[in-house]
Amino acid sequence: MGSIGSMGKPIEGFLVAAIQFPVPIVNSRKDIDHNIESIIRTLHATKAGYPGVELIIFPEYSTQGLNTAKWLSEEFLLDVPGKETELYAKACKEAKVYGVFSIMERNPDSNKNPYNTAIIIDPQGKIILKYRKLFPWNPIEPWYPGDLGMPVCEGPGGSKLAVCICHDGMIPELAREAAYKGCNVYIRISGYSTQVNDQWILTNRSNAWHNLMYTVSVNLAGYDNVFYYFGEGQICNFDGTTLVQGHRNPWEIVTGEIYPKMADNARLSWGLENNIYNLGHRGYVAKPGGEHDAGLTYIKDLAAGKYKLPWEDHMKIKDGSVYGYPTTGGRFGK
C-alpha cells in the first residue's frame, strides 16, 4: 500500500508526496522570496516526476525559516491570503494538485503576536482550508494561540483533510477533534529538531490508531548551524502501522498511496477497537446505546474554563522568559 513509493495514481484513493524541505536559513526578505521560488519549483518537479500525485505537502517553517531573532519582525511576516499565497495558488492550479503550505501569518490585530498558519490550496487555486496552530511549542515559540478551531475540508480520492502543525500532534485531543469532525487523513507539518524524533514518530502512529484515520507527516530536514532537523516523512495506516518512512535526507520526497474509503469502512464495520465510537458509547453491550457521558473530569473542566493540574502551582516554567520573551508590555497578553 505505497511502501514502494508509487509514481502513478491508484485506481481508488490518491497518491501523496511529502517533501523533506531543507531547513531554510533566512536573514532577509530576499531569503523568503527565494524559499517561495524553491517551493514552487519543487512542487512542479514533484508533479513531473510523480505524474499521479494529487497532494503535495511542505513542512512547517519552509516558507519563512526559523530565525528566532527576527521571526516576529514585520519584514518576516506574511498575510493569508496575500501575494505569496497567490503564488502558491498559481502553482497548484498549473500543476493541478492540492498543496499544503506553512505561513507565519501577520495578526490582523497589530497588538497581538503573529499566528503560525497552514493552508491547503486545491487544484483550482483556491484556499480551501486555513488553520492556525492551536498549541504553539511552549515555551520556545511566540505564536498567538490559534482561533479557527480544527477545520476539515474535502480532498482527493474521497479524503477529508485536516492539518495540524508540529507540536499540535503531541496533543491527542486535537487529532480526536479532527476525526470527530470527519477527517480521515490527518496531515502534520513540522519543524522539529532531533530531540523529539522518537516521540514524533510515536504520535503519528497513535493519532492514526486512536482515530481510525491515515496520518501523513513531514518534517524539515538538515542543519541550520544550531539544530539538526530529522526529515523522516511518515505515512501511517488507520490501524497505526507505518506504511512509508523517510530518512533524514534533505529534499527526500516521501510518497505513498492512501485509500480513504478503507478508513471509512473500518469506522463503519469495526466493533473491537472502534475507540472513537466507544468513547461516547461505553459499555453498549450491557446497556443499549451505552453511556454517553465518559465521566472524564479534565474534559468537564476544560469546557468550564477550569482546567488545572494538581501540581500546577509548583511548576517552574509557565511563560516564555526562559527564552527571553517579555512577560509584560508590548504584545504580551493582549
UniProtKB/Swiss-Prot annotation:
The keyword Metal-binding does not apply. One of its GO terms (molecular function) is formamidase activity. It is an enzyme of class 3 (hydrolase). Gene3D superfamilies: Carbon-nitrogen hydrolase. PROSITE patterns: CN_HYDROLASE. One of its GO terms (biological process) is putrescine biosynthetic process from arginine. Residues 14-260 form the CN hydrolase domain. InterPro entries: Aliph_Amidase/BUP, C-N_Hydrolase, C-N_Hydrolase_sf, Formamidase. Its EC number is 3.5.1.49. The active site is at E60 (proton acceptor), K133 (proton donor), C166 (nucleophile). Keywords: Hydrolase. It catalyses: formamide + H2O = formate + NH4(+). The keyword Ubl conjugation does not apply. Is an aliphatic amidase with a restricted substrate specificity, as it only hydrolyzes formamide. Belongs to the carbon-nitrogen hydrolase superfamily. Aliphatic amidase family. This is Formamidase. The lineage of its organism: Bacteria, Pseudomonadati, Campylobacterota, Epsilonproteobacteria, Campylobacterales. The gene is amiF.
